[in-house]
Regions:
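Canonical helix-turn-helix DNA-binding module
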Residues: 45-85
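N-terminal helix-turn-helix DNA-binding core of bacterial DNA-binding proteins
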Residues: 19-53
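N-terminal leader segment of winged-helix/HTH proteins
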Residues: 1-23, 79
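Amphipathic alpha-helical dimerization/coiled-coil segments
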Residues: 92-128
């Protein structure tokens, strides 16, 4: 990851994002995951800048990461009035998240293979 004012995704990070996307993960989710995996904690605004995403895209991605149990959020109170700042961090290391993702994808492949086998059996009756 390159450092400007905040961290930004580099070519290697972008390649990881593309691979996750090729495997069916939404690109914004992949960008967010890769970005926060390289930070101890990061604010929503950091993810927006570093991963080149808009606030709603980060919000949706973070909801999914939290739903999967891969990330957690805490609110950082600012002095004075105003909304708190959301700070995020992963709850599991990226290699463990990849293992879970791989398992999900292998299950999908298994189900596809099973459906194709069943379809093959049904279609073989039509040829007669």
């Amino acid at each position: 990851m390159k450092r400007k004012r905040s961290l930004v995704l580099d070519d290697e990070d972008e390649r990881a994002v593309e691979l996750f996307a090729d495997l069916g993960m939404p690109k914004n989710l992949a960008k967010t995951l890769i970005y926060i995996s390289q930070c101890e904690e990061c604010r929503s605004a950091d993810v927006e800048q570093g991963a080149d995403l808009r606030q709603p895209e980060v919000s949706v991605a973070m909801q999914e990461l939290r739903k999967r149990g891969w990330a957690k959020k805490r609110d950082l109170k600012k002095k004075g009035k105003g909304r708190p700042v959301h700070v995020y961090q992963l709850t599991k290391p990226l290699p463990e998240i990849l293992e879970t993702f791989e398992s999900e994808k292998l299950n999908e492949v298994k189900n596809i293979k099973n459906n194709l086998d069943q379809l093959q059996g049904l279609i073989s009756d039509y040829r007669k």
